Amino acid sequence: MTATSDKVLKIQLRSASATVPTKGSATAAGYDIYASQDITIPAMGQGMVSTDISFTVPVGTYGRIAPRSGLAVKNGIQTGAGVVDRDYTGEVKVVLFNHSQRDFAIKKGDRVAQLILEKIVDDAQIVVVDSLEESARGAGGFGSTGN
């Protein structure tokens, strides 16, 4: 099978400490991303985790750095600032927020986030209008569709 540019995720390992992203299962949506060094995220604080990887996402996609559900549920750790554009070639770092009352230690090789490839519309036209079409939801915002 020949790989075409619209299906290729190119990964650059920037050091011997870097780990190639992996999928936890064959049908997983994301690729696990690994810490390349130890770091402690302070209680009620934040930190930037090095991965020592760079990547170029397939044509027509961007990379979303998303939280790992286990870190969130078990430890109060959330992921922030997660858009990686196709033309970014620097090291991908992961911003983590610690919402717990205790410091959170991350060891080299720990899975800290996941990379999800999402399709984008490159050539959307912007049209300024006087009003939008009515919808059942209307202007209802947060929590407006129920519990």
UniProtKB/Swiss-Prot annotation:
Effect on the protein of changing residue 69 to A: Exhibits negligible activity
Keyword Heme among UniProt keywords: no
Record keywords: Hydrolase, Magnesium, Metal-binding, Nucleotide metabolism
Binding site for dUMP: 69, 82, 85, 88, 93, 137, 142-143
Null mutant phenotype: Leads to dTMP auxotrophy.
EC number: 3.6.1.23
GO BP terms in the entry: dITP catabolic process; dUMP biosynthetic process; dUTP catabolic process; pyrimidine deoxyribonucleoside triphosphate catabolic process
Entry protein name: Deoxyuridine 5'-triphosphate nucleotidohydrolase
Cofactor(s) this protein requires: Mg(2+)
Effect of residue 85 to A: Exhibits negligible activity
Miscellaneous comment: Present with 4340 molecules/cell in log phase SD medium. Each trimer binds three substrate molecules. The ligands are bound between subunits, and for each substrate molecule, residues from adjacent subunits contribute to the binding interactions.
Keyword Magnesium included in the entry's annotation: yes
Record gene name: DUT1
InterPro entries: dUTPase, dUTPase-like, dUTPase-like_sf, dUTPase_trimeric
Gene3D superfamilies: 2.70.40.10
Record Pfam families: dUTPase (PF00692)
Reactions the enzyme catalyzes: dUTP + H2O = dUMP + diphosphate + H(+)
Leader sequence segment: none
Self-association state and partner proteins as the record states: Homotrimer.
pH effects: Optimum pH is 7.0-9.0.
GO CC, alphabetical: cytoplasm; nucleus
Family the UniProt entry places it in: Belongs to the dUTPase family.
